[in-house]
Design a protein with these regions (language model features):
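Bacterial Sec-dependent N-terminal signal peptides
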Residues: 1-25
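Buried hydrophobic residues that stabilize the cores of well-folded domains
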Residues: 20-297
Length: 297
């Protein structure tokens, strides 16, 4: 079981770059690049490298290209990793179509299975304020597979994402500065995960604490992440602590040891993240490095 967990974590880190809650514009997910973007970005090409902790030698694992249109909206992602199945990873591509007002009306997903390509189309509808309120996902035979619904508060902030695919509901709560301070994820009526966010006086995220439901249906801390910034407000590092890992280590060693996963960041002159390096389990040797090549218009 421990080995399986390591494999899944490796896939998530490389494919989604330690994805957190994705950024949204008009109720739509923008990219798998999970940092604020500055400047007139044309493309982002990022590659994840595994690092031999003994020799320091790097091995490229996968590369993703994200292309933006002149309005700053993502129009193409290829390839990304489809995580529909935990035992097999399939490359796929996403294409985003926009109407003449610049709103995403169709997202096409093409998954490259070994024997054929499978196409899924998601059509979006908007309210009178051009906020996305519904998504309908169809297979290539035109069969409706699932729907998504989005609701907003009076300030236009996305507050609820509801999908009949697995009965999932995500609820967002904001502070007076429109920062997300609480994220709750439900399966049916059951709260399965929640994340509290804390910001500094400049509106920078400085702490995330995630709680998960245990076997007794009690919420317990699964991890806490602390973010550090430089004098110019640029993200430079983050540290993630997991009490669950601490308790496991205490059980097998009969001693209390704090486990900390650390990530460091490098930014370009625009303030965009161009590199992140991941150090697991109190290690001084990195295990993964993600390199972002950003081109500008």
């Amino acid at each position: 079981m421990k080995r399986l967990n390591i494999i899944i974590i490796t896939i998530l880190i490389c494919a989604l770059s330690q994805a957190q809650i994705p950024p949204y514009r008009n109720g739509q997910r923008l990219t798998d690049y999970n940092f604020p973007l500055f400047g007139d970005v044309k493309t982002i090409e990022y590659t994840c490298f595994s690092i031999n902790t003994d020799t320091g030698e790097e091995y490229p694992r996968d590369t993703t290209i994200i292309r933006f249109n002149k309005n700053g909206d993502v129009e193409y992602i290829n390839p990304y990793v489809d995580l529909t199945y935990t035992d097999v990873v399939y490359p796929a591509e996403l294409r985003f179509l926009y109407n003449n007002l610049g709103y995403n009306t169709l997202t096409r997903e093409v998954i490259d299975y070994d024997y054929m390509d499978v196409v899924y189309d998601t059509y979006y509808t908007y309210d009178e304020d051009w906020r996305r309120i519904k998504g309908e996902n169809y297979n290539e035979d035109g069969k409706l597979l699932y729907t998504e619904e989005y609701t907003y508060d009076r300030q236009g902030n996305l507050t609820h994402e509801k999908s009949n695919k697995g009965g999932e509901l995500v609820v967002y709560t904001y502070d007076t500065n429109m920062n997300i301070i609480l994220i709750e994820r439900y399966i049916g009526d059951k709260l399965v995960e929640k994340t509290n966010r804390t910001y500094n006086e400049n509106g920078k995220l400085i702490q995330e604490t995630t709680y998960s439901s245990n076997r007794l249906n009690e919420m317990e801390i699964s991890e806490t992440t602390l973010y550090s910034y430089g004098e110019n407000g640029v993200l430079i590092s983050s540290e993630t602590k997991s009490p669950i890992h601490e308790m496991f280590l205490q059980y097998i060693t009969d001693s209390r040891t704090e486990i900390t996963d650390r990530t460091t960041y490098k930014c370009d002159s625009y303030g965009n993240v161009i590199e992140e390096t991941y150090y697991p389990n109190n290690s001084t040797s990195p295990q993964f490095r993600i390199e972002y090549k950003i081109s500008y218009r």
